[in-house]
């Protein structure tokens, strides 16, 4: 009960220090605490968008981790990504400064509000943003803590005036099951974070607890187009669950009459809620982002809006006001009339969804899909190697770089080159190529881009920075590139 105790004793001047404050999850919580009146500071190894944003508010940021950074702090917040040998952790333990996990701090914030927790292997960040837009359109100004930058706000977290809090619930280390939410959303469940869970069944069990831990008056929202989620929903009888999908005719909320282009998706929705007679049709809902997966994300938000009686007008207005999320199919530049897209996809299922969207758009433009993928983490590649071999079918031309380690040690035989070799050997793709250096992607674009093409730069590593610097890199070689964002 940290936050409640601080409030009761008026100890808001005590300093809360975040180790790894530049991380998207940590920076969001730090920003909310700062806006609530707490004294916040933090450290990180490098400067980034998040640290610069926090510094602009007056939050002190230390570059690098050192014992002296926590000289005058009362609490230390860490995430699961922080090495236990970190000098600031060692100093906090030595001085008996309370160390709080990021998920526990998030739980404290959520305990004070009526909370919506959004989880799932993919789509959490976009879904969280969409839900927030509907709340605002309904006249409820929520507090939001997201896993990505919401373009409407240019931040991943902001303090609202209502009693609602909407948060992305990270499932990577099972701490999300302890988050005190009233409404829980599950977008999908795929084999991910198996370095922590060890097996898929344990991961599924965590999602089961995520739902069953809801209070009796709460409800879950689940996508039953996903077979694992459907099975889970069928097994749970003690909590109210609202289902959604595109292919599932028995879902409570279904999208149909779907049309999508490079900038948006339009669809109709059929609503048949449990214990409610009759069916409601909402026609011509438009979301300003393409892709079937984003339509599913919007259905989750619609389910929450319908259950909370937001009304059809608020739902449509909320989506009209949505401006997307940074690094989710973000068009960053144009070269030779080809679109260059920056996307966070780093799991095989995310890659398939992103490339399917790109393929649909490219076909309408008589173009091709050029995929440049930077794998993220050796452990993920090892666990999902076979899935990675099969997820690039919608790319007409494929380039794979070496693996972005994200702090992990190399694993023998697990490299970007070995993935390309296996894809080629097993004939899963006839135009798969290895990029020895990310900078070689500039030449790939110069040599291959043509009018109507979709150039998709994917990964959770530094490929995003590269994509956003393409105008300068192309200009330095004498080629003109139009920057979009």
Swiss-Prot record:
Keywords: ATP-binding, Cell cycle, Cell division, Cell shape, Cell wall biogenesis/degradation, Cytoplasm, Ligase, Nucleotide-binding, Peptidoglycan synthesis. One of its GO terms (cellular component) is cytoplasm. GO terms for biological process: cell division; cell wall organization; peptidoglycan biosynthetic process; regulation of cell shape. Gene3D superfamilies: Mur ligase, C-terminal domain, Mur-like, catalytic domain, NAD(P)-binding Rossmann-like Domain. Belongs to the MurCDEF family. Cell wall formation. This is UDP-N-acetylmuramate--L-alanine ligase. The lineage of its organism: Bacteria, Pseudomonadati, Pseudomonadota, Alphaproteobacteria, Rickettsiales.
């Amino acid at each position: 009960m940290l936050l409640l105790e601080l409030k009761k004793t008026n100890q808001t001047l005590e300093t809360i220090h975040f180790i790894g404050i530049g991380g998207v999850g940590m920076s969001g919580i730090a920003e909310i605490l700062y806006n609530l009146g707490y004294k916040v500071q933090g450290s990180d190894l490098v400067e980034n968008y998040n640290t610069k944003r926090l510094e602009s508010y007056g939050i002190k940021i230390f570059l690098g981790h050192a014992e002296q950074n926590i000289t005058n702090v009362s609490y230390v917040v860490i995430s699961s990504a922080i090495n236990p040998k970190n000098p600031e952790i060692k100093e906090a333990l030595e001085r008996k400064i309370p160390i709080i996990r990021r998920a526990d701090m998030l739980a404290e914030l959520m305990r004070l509000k009526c909370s919506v927790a959004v989880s799932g292997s993919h789509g959490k960040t976009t879904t969280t943003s969409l839900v927030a837009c509907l709340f605002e359109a309904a006249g409820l100004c929520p507090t939001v803590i997201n896993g990505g930058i919401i373009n409407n706000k240019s931040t991943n977290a902001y303090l609202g005036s209502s009693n609602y809090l909407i948060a992305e619930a990270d499932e990577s280390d099972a701490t999300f099951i302890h988050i005190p939410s009233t409404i829980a959303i599950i977008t999908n469940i795929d084999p991910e974070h198996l370095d922590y869970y060890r097996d898929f069944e344990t991961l599924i069990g965590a999602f089961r607890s995520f739902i069953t831990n809801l209070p009796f008056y709460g409800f879950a929202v689940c996508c039953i187009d996903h077979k694992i989620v459907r099975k889970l929903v069928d097994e749970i009888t003690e909590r109210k669950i609202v289902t959604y999908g595109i292919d599932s005719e028995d879902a409570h909320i279904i999208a149909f009459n779907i049309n999508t282009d490079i900038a948006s998706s339009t669809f109709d929705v059929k609503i048949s809620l449990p214990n409610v007679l009759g069916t409601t049709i909402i026609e011509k809902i438009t979301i300003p982002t393409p892709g079937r997966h984003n339509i599913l994300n919007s259905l989750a938000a619609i389910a929450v809006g319908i259950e909370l009686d937001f009304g059809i007008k608020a739902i449509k207005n909320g989506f009209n006001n949505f401006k997307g999320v940074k690094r989710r199919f973000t068009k960053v530049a144009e070269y030779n009339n080809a679109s260059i897209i920056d996307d966070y996809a780093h799991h095989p299922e995310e890659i398939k969804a992103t490339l399917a969207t790109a393929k649909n758009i490219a076909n309408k433009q008589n173009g091709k899909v050029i995929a440049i993928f930077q794998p993220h983490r050796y452990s993920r590649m090892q666990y999902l190697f076979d899935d990675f071999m099969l997820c690039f079918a919608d790319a007409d031309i494929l380039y794979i770089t070496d693996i972005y380690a994200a702090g992990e040690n190399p694993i023998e035989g697990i490299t970007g080159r070995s993935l390309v070799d296996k894809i080629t050997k097993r004939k899963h793709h006839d135009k798969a190529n290895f990029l020895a250096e990310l900078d070689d992607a500039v030449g790939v674009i110069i040599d291959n881009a043509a009018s109507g093409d979709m150039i998709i730069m994917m990964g959770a590593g530094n490929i995003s920075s590269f994509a956003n610097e393409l105008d300068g890199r192309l200009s330095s070689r004498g080629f003109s590139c139009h920057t979009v964002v």
